[in-house]
Amino acid sequence: MYLRKISAPLMTMLLLNGCAYIPHKPLVDGTTSAQPAPASAPLPNGSIFQTVQPMNYGYQPLFEDRRPRNIGDTLTITLQENVSASKSSSANASRNGTSSFGVTTAPRYLDGLLGNGRADMEITGDNTFGGKGGANANNTFSGTITVTVDQVLANGNLHVVGEKQIAINQGTEFIRFSGVVNPRTISGSNSVTSTQVADARIEYVGNGYINEAQTMGWLQRFFLNVSPY
């Protein structure tokens, strides 16, 4: 009987703790790497040099830049994100109104009620409103990450994806990146800045006790949601 009294509150707390878990939805979903497709079987054409041989996979002419163009090729992304935004608004409204009405003659029996044989009426109204708001946001992200080509689009653009994991003490930091790269923007050092990548998805998250310390507790979130203030 004593164990039942203890187990019931304990199970309730465990259920509430499980419901309090909020899963993180990553911006870069799916696999973060790609393997090159196996080379097709060579067709004899009478030449000594066969470009489709496995040992010559990725062959490029001597005077052509070495740029990624196949699935599995790598590319270095230079992260240079600096976004700043500000917004302010204000509004003022004022309205005044006055109305008067007078009657110089009135029945004699209303003299005692109205006074001096006349009836006067005056209405005055005043309404004033003022509002002001503002918001500022600044975000800076810098670094490098090497990604892999996982798709070659019909127009020649490359869809790239990559992930970097860094373990620090008892926590792990994840940097994920995906986007579409125009091969013409790739420099001679096989790199491109993140500002030249279309549909860029940049994610920097971590796990461990430091990340858990930055998460609000389930009971605190409960009171935050139900509190009217």
UniProtKB/Swiss-Prot annotation:
This protein's membrane topology, according to the annotation, is: Lipid-anchor
Q: A Pfam family this protein belongs to? A: FlgH
Q: Which residues form the signal peptide?
A: 1-18
Q: Could you state a single Gene Ontology molecular function term?
A: cytoskeletal motor activity
Query: S-diacylglycerol cysteine lipidation: where?
Result: 19
Lipidated residues (N-palmitoyl cysteine)? 19
A GO cellular component term found in this entry reads: bacterial-type flagellum basal body, distal rod, L ring
GO BP, sorted A to Z: bacterial-type flagellum-dependent cell motility
* Compartment(s): Cell outer membrane; Bacterial flagellum basal body
Task: Recite the UniProt keywords alphabetically.
Answer: Bacterial flagellum, Cell outer membrane, Lipoprotein, Membrane, Palmitate, Signal
NCBIfam families, per the entry: PRK00249.1-1
How is this protein organized at the quaternary level?
Answer: The basal body constitutes a major portion of the flagellar organelle and consists of four rings (L,P,S, and M) mounted on a central rod.
Q: Which family does it belong to?
A: Belongs to the FlgH family.
Q: Which purpose does this protein serve, as stated in its record?
A: Assembles around the rod to form the L-ring and probably protects the motor/basal body from shearing forces during rotation.
Q: What is this protein called?
A: Flagellar L-ring protein 2
Organism this protein belongs to: Yersinia pestis
